[in-house]
From Swiss-Prot:
Protein name: ATP-dependent protease ATPase subunit HslU
Subunit note: A double ring-shaped homohexamer of HslV is capped on each side by a ring-shaped HslU homohexamer. The assembly of the HslU/HslV complex is dependent on binding of ATP.
Keywords, comma-separated and alphabetical: ATP-binding, Chaperone, Cytoplasm, Nucleotide-binding, Stress response
NCBIfam families in alphabetical order: hslU (TIGR00390), PRK05201.1 (NF003544)
Similarity comment: family membership: Belongs to the ClpX chaperone family. HslU subfamily.
Pfam families tied to this protein: AAA, AAA_2
Chain's gene name: hslU
Species in which this protein is naturally found: Desulforamulus reducens (strain ATCC BAA-1160 / DSM 100696 / MI-1)
Entry's Gene Ontology molecular function annotations: ATP binding; ATP hydrolysis activity; peptidase activity; proteasome-activating activity
PANTHER family associated with the record: ATP-DEPENDENT CLP PROTEASE ATP-BINDING SUBUNIT CLPX-LIKE, MITOCHONDRIAL-RELATED (PTHR48102), ATP-DEPENDENT PROTEASE ATPASE SUBUNIT HSLU (PTHR48102:SF3)
Residue numbers binding ATP: 18, 60-65, 278, 344, 416
Length: 466
């Protein structure tokens, strides 16, 4: 894990997310505290638990993106879960422990990818050798067992001749392999075909079973059945280029110690994992209501509580402690309030950050400032058709103003409004782009107003289209 200072973390997040300084600072400090904890003495490490964060703010202002970018920044296992997907224990649906299992799966996948990259060069060399062997296989050595009568009537001479012939073939194959290696180094064999053996991924009778019934045990039925019914191998005819990819994966798998990888991945999930609980306001029990749905919501909160507090969850990779996993909960809290969550759960999210609604200037910055801004994305997309597209400064101001106005008049969906507006604005250009190869188009404020005037002025129409 990279040891970034809070200021460095905020600076990195600024490359992708506009505004929301309070939220960025909160997650940056939480991240730095993990690094500080790792420097403590053994007797104190277990005592220091992460301070979980509750983000409050409307949709589309950057709650999820802040958490996702943070995890990517430090290469930490990250899962985003919607709290509304969970049901109480005993009811049909996903149980809350599944989020910890998902986190471990993510950690295994991440670490496996890292290990594969580490051994990739070696695996490629081994794969190339296997390709050479398949293209020019050595002949089988002639059997030495002979009939006793043959030994009496010149059988020894025949055997010597066969051995000599086999040695000659071997010499020829060695020379052929050297020639193939030279051709391979010059990439002259890439389009040649050969047959390789691959594992058949299908498992017999898997459709009879359902993973959901055994999910709470942390058991994958495909793995269980895979050990009962060994996977069959089948032959595939592929090019040398494709064969190299397949065989490199196979060789990389052999070079990786999966037991060691699993132990490291579980440890990484426990110490550095981030679980993002979205829509947590939807499971809050509102004051003065006592319906069956509210009882269910309260039950889900009580089920989440021990995991956030710190408990041990059984997975197919072994027990996983949740004591030091960072939980970031988020919700709009339009109807419910944070105080509508059960008191015990409120206490487990001591850091509360309110994210602000986006202003006109925020929308303008979102269009151009982030590293992979929306304007850059659309410009590059249409550029693949040979169409050069440019947005003038006043067109960006106009687009930002329309996004802000429509959000104020209708549902406030934050920065996502820009996606719908840009899609509508560039609808005709995207359709005609293949016929405009080699041309240039400048989009100014007049063009924006012309394309969007009907939608913006008609409130009912904007509600459906934008």
């Amino acid at each position: 894990m990279e040891a970034l200072t809070p200021r460095q973390t905020v600076r990195e997040l600024d490359k992708y997310i506009v505004g929301q300084e309070k939220a960025k600072k909160a997650v940056a400090v939480a991240l730095r505290n993990r690094y500080r904890r790792s420097k403590l003495k053994e007797d104190l490490i277990d005592e220091v638990v992460p301070k979980n964060i509750l983000m409050i703010g409307p949709t589309g202002v950057g709650k999820t993106e802040i958490a996702r970018r943070l995890a990517k920044l430090v290469k930490a296992p990250f899962v985003k879960i919607e709290a509304t997907k969970f049901t109480e224990v005993g009811y049909v649906g996903r149980d809350v422990e599944s989020m910890v299992r998902d986190l471990v799966e993510t950690s295994i996948r991440m670490l496996k990818q890292e290990k594969v990259e580490e051994v990739e060069e070696r695996a490629k060399r081994l794969a190339d050798e296997r390709i050479i062997e398949l293209l020019a296989p050595y002949p089988n050595r002639p059997t030495q067992t002979k009939n006793p009568f043959e030994m009496l009537f010149g059988g020894v001479q025949d055997t010597q001749q066969e051995d000599k012939s086999w040695e000659q073939q071997n010499s020829r194959i060695k020379f052929e392999r050297e020639t193939l290696r030279e051709k391979m180094s010059r990439c002259e064999l890439e389009k040649d075909y050969l047959e390789i053996e691959v594992e058949d991924q299908s498992t017999p009778m898997l459709e009879v079973f359902s993973n959901s019934g055994v999910e709470e045990m942390g058991v994958n039925m495909q793995d269980v059945l895979g050990s009962i019914f060994p996977r069959k191998k089948r032959k595939r005819k592929v090019t040398v280029e494709e064969a190299r990819k397949i065989l490199t994966q196979q060789e990389a798998q052999k070079l990786i110690d999966m037991d060691e990888l699993t132990a490291q991945a579980v440890k990484r999930a426990e110490d550095h994992g981030i679980i993002f609980l979205d829509e947590i306001d939807k499971i809050a029990t509102r004051e003065g209501t006592t319906g069956s749905a509210d009882v269910s919501r309260g039950g889900v909160q009580r089920d989440i509580l021990p995991i956030v507090e710190g408990s041990t969850v059984m997975t197919k990779y072994g027990p996983v402690k949740t004591d030091h996993i960072l939980f970031i909960a988020a919700g709009a809290f339009h109807i419910a309030k944070p105080s509508d969550l059960i008191p015990e759960l409120q206490g487990r999210f001591p850091i509360r950050v309110e994210l602000e609604s986006l202003s006109r200037s925020d929308f303008e910055q979102i269009l151009t400032e982030p590293q992979n801004s929306l304007i850059k994305q659309y410009t590059e997309l249409l550029g693949t058709e040979g169409l050069k597209i440019e947005f003038s400064k006043n067109s960006l101001v106009e687009i930002a103003d329309i996004a802000y106005t429509v959000n104020e008049q209708n549902e406030n969906i934050g920065a996502r409004r820009l996606h719908t507006i840009l899609e509508k604005l560039l609808e005709d250009v995207s359709f005609e782009a293949p016929e405009l190869n080699g041309q240039s188009l400048t989009i100014d404020s007049d063009y924006v107003r012309e394309k969007l005037k009907d939608v913006v002025t008609n409130r009912d129409l904007s509600r459906y289209i934008l």
